[in-house]
């Protein structure tokens, strides 16, 4: 459970960092860029710890996919970006893809079970 919390923190940090990048580009000052740097760095640190117990493909798909989903939604709400039918179709496809990757991941087989199975 702890590693899933780390993954959630990585996703939240990535969303915040990416939105800060956009905010920095439309406002004056360096605060947005500093926040972006800190949050993206934290995102990678949290992700690197999360993949110790979560399959890399699953963790990365969730990290990137959920990030894209929320960044797109917040960009529409905060920065008045357009949300076309094509973008919506892409986001729906993304959600289904993440669900397929998550459901298709098996837990690693215990080394002792492998040795017993190989000996038989």
Curated annotation (Swiss-Prot):
GO BP: any one term: glycine betaine transport
Principal location class: membrane
Any one Gene Ontology cellular component term annotated for this protein: plasma membrane
Claim: Membrane is one of the keywords in the record: yes
Keyword Ribonucleoprotein tagged: no
HAMAP family with a match to the protein in the record: MdtJ (MF_01598)
Cited function: Catalyzes the excretion of spermidine.
Protein name: Spermidine export protein MdtJ
Organism expressing this protein natively: Citrobacter koseri (strain ATCC BAA-895 / CDC 4225-83 / SGSC4696)
